[in-house]
Amino acid sequence: MKKDKNNESMKLKVIPIGGLGLIGMNMTAFEYNDSIVVVDCGLAFPENDMLGIDLVIPDVTYLKENIDKVKGFVFTHGHEDHIGALPYILKEVCVPLYGTKLTMGLIERKLTEHGMMRSTKRKVVRPGQSINLGEFRIEFIKTNHSIADAVALAIYSPAGIVVHTGDFKVDYTPVFGDAIDLQRFAEIGKKGVLALMCDSTNAERPGFSASERTVGRTFDNLFAEHSHNRIIIATFASNVDRVQQIINTADKYGRKVVVEGRSMVNIISTASELGYLNIPENTLIEVEQMKNYPDEKMVLITTGSQGESMAALSRMASNMHKKVSIKPGDTIIFSSNPIPGNEKAVSKVINELSMKGANVIFQDAHVSGHACQEEIKLIYSLVKPKYSIPVHGEYRHMKAQGKIAENLGIEKDNIFIMKAGDVLEMDANAAKVVGRVQVGSILVDGLGVGDVGNIVLRDRQHLAEDGIVIAVLTLEKYTGQILSGPDIVSRGFVYVREAEDLMEEARQVVEDSMEYCISHHITDWGKMKNSIRDSLGEFLWKRTKRRPMILPIIMEVE
């Protein structure tokens, strides 16, 4: 961190690029003088009405406009909502990456898939270490979360210290590694902290979050209770500690383990290579080897805990999985809670599994990876910030944390419930939102990044709801007379064979519309198409009370 007396009067800028007011797409820029450091680079998953969209990533126009200032991306942990946008963002903002060992391992697998390893500088940082990036010094502080190697960040600048918790919980008995370094939070608090940016996800939940080890005891009880059944457990692929406890319990009860789902296989492979998973020899087998073992000696760890249609468990439930079929008596354990918005999809999968005779367990086999109210209070009490900036979560979650901060004695004017794009300037004397930068959501559809916008989504929704009717006709170039057609083609509107009378009337409506244009000397194709669109649309609405997309196609021959 550079020290310059001329800079002491400058203010630190905090600019959330994404991740506020929604779950996912976490990214925050810290700017001081000629230096910008970006914390996290996450994606969000599409809403149900974003038809055909694969991923949503943040708009980084501000970073591109200030690319000479950007010193690097620093990561709090390896979840997709914190690292998932990297392959897309690095094509426009290619700067060095800094993260802990497992986080960087997951990032490197992602970069390898996209052929970006050689072009990207990376550095592994251990908890307790610090790095210097321009005007900033950034210290990595050990925390606990639902993935190993999670850290908080103490961001030092000439304007003061900002503590960013990342996603965290206080777990005194973690499955892997050490407990959260509360002592370091307290030591930094004694130095004087300008602002605390704290995880808000569970700010509405009273008390403390349960330790991850309690899930291990639940697994032990369930394995003992269902000792004569095949067990299938769906959980988040990134929850390495959860996977470790499943493997430990399977080993205790003499069961073999099969891993299904691409993301689950990839993360378990990476975590095992880096030493974050301890898998007893001969415990893991390939799915093809299951037939060699009785059901009561098998455990499957699978993706699909959120009801994702293409995940392994969903494909098993709908008979679409090529290698695993659900049998009556199978015990299916959902070791997760539905993310808000996924409840209907999860319920659908549970119903499909139940109809196949499986025993589905979806309670008491999960604990949250996020701090509840008492843990949030503990961090505030240790850090003692001047300003509170709730992050991570929906607006109501951030509002709930703001209330906690106020109850702990932070002045209301020093609590900032920000929106993505807000520019907060602060120093020891004052803090204020002084403006906004361009932010937003970039939609990823296959290989296309940002080429699908609201108009395309609206068209897709229109097609999904009411279908399409295409009117095709051929005109003589010089006279404008109809030579062939109109032919009516329908998809997703009515079944043509059962609506021949309607289609014949529709042809007549199009023909009448064209004759009107010819008699009134309307020769502009755009106006002709609008006439067809209006008259056919009005006719179909009167007859069906539906408004399909209407696509007139006019061809011209000599």
Which residues does each PLM region occupy?
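Conserved beta-strand scaffold positions in the cores of enzyme catalytic domains, especially
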Residues: 14, 122-124, 195-197, 332, ...
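C-terminal tails and terminal domains of large nucleic-acid-associated
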Residues: 521-558
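His/Asp/Glu-rich metal-coordinating catalytic cores
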Residues: 2-74, 79-292, 311-325, 344-347
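A glycine- and charged-residue-rich anion-binding loop/surface
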Residues: 20, 44-48, 52, 69-70, ...
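Short glycine-rich phosphate-binding loop at a beta-alpha junction
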Residues: 96, 389, 551-552
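Hard-cation-handling environments
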Residues: 205-335, 339-522, 529, 534
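Solvent-exposed loop and beta-edge segments used for protein-protein assembly and interaction
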Residues: 22, 147, 294, 463-465, ...
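Conserved hydrophobic residues forming the short capping helix/wall of the S-adenosyl-L-methionine
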Residues: 111, 405, 540
